């Protein structure tokens, strides 16, 4: 019993320390909405394998959702252009949604997964001027 505990406890500690988080920012560049990793984030991933944009309130409609195989995550580097299909083998275990138009004055949440255990997120708003 003691031997099992001595093996399990370090394993749990090691596995729990493998994940990380980072902040995403929505920015307008060249007439497109792009998602970048915040320069202030302690983690600076270069690529991703999963992204989702949803309304923060109301019907919580999903505006864009895509996920590719873990093996293909390095094919999709930041910055990520809103609505542009991710490269690689798309996963079939969840519904994908192509990029839908935004509404002004609505707050949106963006979330992304990098590798197996990197998680990014952020919020953004399209203002009355469309910015």
What are the residue ranges of the model-derived segments?
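Surface-exposed, short loops/turns at beta-strand junctions within beta-sandwich domains
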Residues: 99-105
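Short acidic/polar inter-strand loop motif in beta-rich domains
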Residues: 114-121
């Amino acid at each position: 019993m003691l031997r099992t505990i001595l093996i399990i406890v370090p394993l749990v500690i090691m596995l729990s320390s493998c994940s990380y988080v980072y902040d995403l920012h929505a920015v307008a560049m060249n007439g497109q909405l792009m998602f970048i990793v915040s320069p202030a984030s302690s983690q600076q991933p270069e690529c991703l394998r999963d992204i989702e944009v949803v309304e923060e309130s109301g019907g919580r409609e999903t505006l864009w959702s895509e996920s590719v195989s873990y093996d293909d995550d390095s094919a999709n580097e930041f910055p990520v252009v809103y609505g542009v299909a991710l490269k690689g083998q798309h996963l079939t275990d969840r519904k994908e949604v192509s990029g839908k138009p935004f509404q002004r004055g609505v707050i949106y949440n963006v979330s992304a997964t990098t590798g197996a255990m990197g998680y990014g997120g952020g919020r953004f708003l399209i203002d009355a001027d469309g910015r």
